[in-house]
Amino acid sequence: MFIDKAKIHLKSGKGGDGAVAFRKEKYVPAGGPAGGDGGKGGNIIFVVDEGMRTLMDFRYKMHYSAENGENGKGRMQYGKDGEDLILRVPPGTIIREEKTGHLVADLTQPKERRIIAKGGKGGKGNVHFKSATRQAPQFAIAGVKGEELTVTLELKLIADVGLVGFPNVGKSTLLSVVTSAKPKIADYHFTTLTPNLGVVRTKRGDSFVLADIPGLIEGAHEGTGLGHEFLRHVERTKLLIHVLDVAGIEGRDPLEDFEKINEELKLYNEKLSTRPQVVAANKTDVMGENENLKKLTEALAEKGIEVFPVSAATKQGLDELLDYVSIKLKELEDTEVELEEVEEEKLYELKEKDTNQFTVKKEDDTYIVEGDFLERLIMSTNFEDMDSLTYFQKVLRRKGIIDELKKLGIEDGEFVKIYDVEFEYFH
C-alpha cells in the first residue's frame, strides 16, 4: 500500500456569536447595549516538517476541525479566538481540493506554512447597533461559519537522485549499502511498495539524498500494476541512476529493460525523458561469461550515458559510481525542478462567497431565498423585537433581495421563505 496519497476532510472554526447584553446604569435605556463581539474561528494551517517522510498519520485520521471562536459576553467583553489547528506534512506535499481538483498548495520549503481552511469571522455584539432611534437593540450578529472542504494530499518525493529500474534488479540492496536506510529486501516483484530515502556520504565528503523509487513494469504510464504511484516519485529528482541486472538471472536483456523503462518515463511525462541518467550495471559478481555488459556499454556510449559495473552485494564499483553522481549533481545545482503553479485565487473561494451571493427561486406559490449570509442573518434576528425586525428588512433591501423579488414579479400577500422562516410580502 502506498502512503503517498491521502484524502482528508477539513473544517475550520466558526466565528463566535455576538452577545446581546446591557449595562446597569441610571438614566440609560435598558442599561445601554454592552454585548461584546464573538471571537474569530481557528484556521487550519499546514506546515512543512523536514522530519516527516510519509503521509502515514493521515491514514488513521481523516477528519480535522479547528476550534470555534467563543461567543461574545456582557460588559463589552469579546469572545476568545479559536485556536488554529496545525497539520504537519512532509516536504513535497501537494494539496488539492478534492471536489474540483484545483491545486491549493505545493509545499516544498522547510517550515513553510499555508492556511488551507480559514476560520470564520466573529459576530458583532449589540453594542454596534445602537443609534439615535434604536437605544436598546435586542439583537446581535452571529459568527460566520468556518470553511469546510475535502482535500487530497499527494506526496511527491523530494530527493536529489532517484533509483529506477524493473523490480528485483537490486535497487533496495544498493540503497541499503550506500546509505543508512533499511528497506525491506526480498526476491520477488514489487518488493518495494513505498519510496525509501537515504543520505549518501561519499569518500570525497559530499552528500546527497538518494531515493529508491518503487519498481516499474511495462504499461506503468497507464497505471498498470502500481505504475502511476511509482512514476509520481520520479518527477522531482535531478538525476536518475538506472539500475540494470547485467547478470540476466531472470533471463532479462538489460538493454531491452533500459529502453522499456525509459519509454514508460517518457509516456508518463515527456520531461522525464530528458532527465540526466547514469547506469548502474548491477550483479557483476554473478555475471559469469556473457556479453551483456559489453553490449550495454557500447550501446549507451552512443547516447552519451555512462555505465558503471557494480555489485550491490559486494560493494564493488560503488565508490566510483557515487563520486560520479556527486560531481554530476554539482553541475546541476542551478537546475530547478519545475513546480505546479499554485492557484492563489482558489484558497478562499468559500469565504468570498459568504459576502453577498444569494439565490431566489419560485416553488409553487412561495419564493425561496438562500445564501450563506442569510443563514447568519436569520440566526441573528429576534423576530419578536421591532428594532431587530427593522434591521432584518434593511439588510434585505441593501443586499438587493427585495429588488430581485420584484423582478420575479412578487405581489403583496405572497410568501417568502428564507431557510426556516416564512413570511408574507407587503410592499
Curated annotation (Swiss-Prot):
UniProt GO cellular component terms: cytoplasm
Top-rank taxon, per record: Bacteria
Keywords annotated in UniProt: Cytoplasm, GTP-binding, Hydrolase, Magnesium, Metal-binding, Nucleotide-binding
EC number: 3.6.5.-
Quaternary state and interactors: Monomer.
Keyword Repeat included in the entry's annotation: no
Protein's recorded name: GTPase Obg
Function: An essential GTPase which binds GTP, GDP and possibly (p)ppGpp with moderate affinity, with high nucleotide exchange rates and a fairly low GTP hydrolysis rate. Plays a role in control of the cell cycle, stress response, ribosome biogenesis and in those bacteria that undergo differentiation, in morphogenesis control.
Domain OCT: 347-427
EC main group: hydrolase
Domain Obg, chain residue ranges per copy: 1-158
Pfam families: DUF1967, GTP1_OBG, MMR_HSR1
Residue ranges occupied by any OBG-type G domain in the UniProt entry: 159-330
Binding residues annotated for Mg(2+), in chain numbering: 172, 192
Entry binding sites for GTP: 165-172, 190-194, 212-215, 282-285, 311-313
Species of origin: Alkaliphilus metalliredigens (strain QYMF)
